[in-house]
C-alpha cells in the first residue's frame, strides 16, 4: 500500500479562489474589501519570505494589504502604539505580527495588545480560551488548516485516536483542542514523553509539529494512518524535509502530507479565511 497524498497546495488554491469570489461579491454590494496589516520587525530572511507570501496572497484575493517593515531596534512602546492605532483603524480587519521577534521585544505582551476580533493569527488568550470552551471565534491558522486537510480525506474523525507530537502554543496545544472538538481521542506528546514510538504506533491520525527533521520514523506509523507533517526543516544541501521520515512512512500510511506543499499553504489560507471572517462577522 502506498499512501495517498493530501495536496495542501491544491486545497489552499481552491480556498483562495473561493475567498476571491466572496471579496468580489462584497465589492459589488458596495462593501469594502477585508484589510490585513502585517508587521515585520527586523530582517530575518525566513520571516521576510513568509511575509512576502502573505502579501502576495492578499493581492490575489483582493484584500487591502498594509505592510509595516520596521527596523530591528524598534522599541516595545513604538510597536504597542502602532498596534493601538491599527486596532482603531476601521479599514483593518486583521493584524499580524510576524514571529519570531528580536530578543528585546516581549511577543506575549504585543500579541495580547491586538484586539481579539482582529487577532487573525488566533494566538490571543481570548481566542485560545474560546477554542478551549468549544466556542471558536478566530482559530489558530495552522491547526485550522490541518482540520481542513483531514476533512479532505473523507475520513470519519469521530472516535479516532489522534496523536500530536509537539506541544507548542502555536501548533501542538491548539491542535489538540481542534481534534477534541472533532470527536477524536487525543494524546499529546512532548520532549518528556517516554516511548514516543509506542504512542505514534497506536495513532489513527498523527500530527507531527516538533521542528526536528526525521524525528518520527516511518516504521512507527500504524498501517493506514493519516500522517500530517507540520515540520519544515532546511538541510545543508538546501532540501526541505519534514519531521517524519517521508520515504519510509509512505508505504505504511493511508494518507500523508508532503513537505513542502502540505501544511504550509494551508496556514496561509487559514489567515485569509480568518481575515474574511472578521470582516464579515465581527466588523460589520
UniProtKB/Swiss-Prot annotation:
InterPro entries: Aminoacid_DH-like_N_sf, NAD(P)-bd_dom_sf, THF_DH/CycHdrlase, THF_DH/CycHdrlase_cat_dom, THF_DH/CycHdrlase_CS, THF_DH/CycHdrlase_NAD-bd_dom. The keyword Chloroplast does not apply. PROSITE patterns: THF_DHG_CYH_1. GO terms for cellular component: cytosol. Pathway: One-carbon metabolism; tetrahydrofolate interconversion. NADP(+) binds at residues 166-168, 232. GO terms for biological process: L-histidine biosynthetic process; methionine biosynthetic process; purine nucleotide biosynthetic process; tetrahydrofolate interconversion. Keywords: Amino-acid biosynthesis, Histidine biosynthesis, Hydrolase, Methionine biosynthesis, Multifunctional enzyme, NADP, One-carbon metabolism, Oxidoreductase, Purine biosynthesis. It catalyses: (6R)-5,10-methylene-5,6,7,8-tetrahydrofolate + NADP(+) = (6R)-5,10-methenyltetrahydrofolate + NADPH; (6R)-5,10-methenyltetrahydrofolate + H2O = (6R)-10-formyltetrahydrofolate + H(+). GO terms for molecular function: methenyltetrahydrofolate cyclohydrolase activity; methylenetetrahydrofolate dehydrogenase (NADP+) activity. Its EC number is 1.5.1.5, 3.5.4.9. Pfam families: THF_DHG_CYH, THF_DHG_CYH_C. Catalyzes the oxidation of 5,10-methylenetetrahydrofolate to 5,10-methenyltetrahydrofolate and then the hydrolysis of 5,10-methenyltetrahydrofolate to 10-formyltetrahydrofolate. Belongs to the tetrahydrofolate dehydrogenase/cyclohydrolase family. Homodimer. This is Bifunctional protein FolD 1. It comes from Ectopseudomonas mendocina (strain ymp). The gene is folD1.
